[in-house]
């Protein structure tokens, strides 16, 4: 099997990717965002908005933002932290390491913004994603019940950068 980088190209998002990313978001996730939301994150944190493409077609993405707040890992005071807002990979491209590569690249980008830790929310029923995030060093730091619009809860998963 060919190496991931030989099949898929990971690169920074650009505005020409917007429609493809929005389509992936709508196809893969129940949480959908407006075009303004995507563009706003891109403009504020361009290094942390990554797409995966195969043959010049976007097949996955992750977008993040940088926040200042209380540590989810017991550190005292306020810390700069990355927030993985959304990760999605088209179903026919899953289980090939794309999600792992996207999140890893996003974490590298968060360091460019001097983030010391990062976190994300994941549906408590999404065992596959939870397993991936644990593999990447995230740990469940709390659970928010009825977090999503449909009433499902979310695990907040956090890790140091």
Where do the protein language model's features map onto the residues?
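Conserved phosphate-binding and hydrolysis motifs of nucleotide-dependent enzymes
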Residues: 56, 60, 97-99, 137
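Acetyl-CoA-dependent GNAT
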Residues: 2-4, 8, 12-92, 103-113, ...
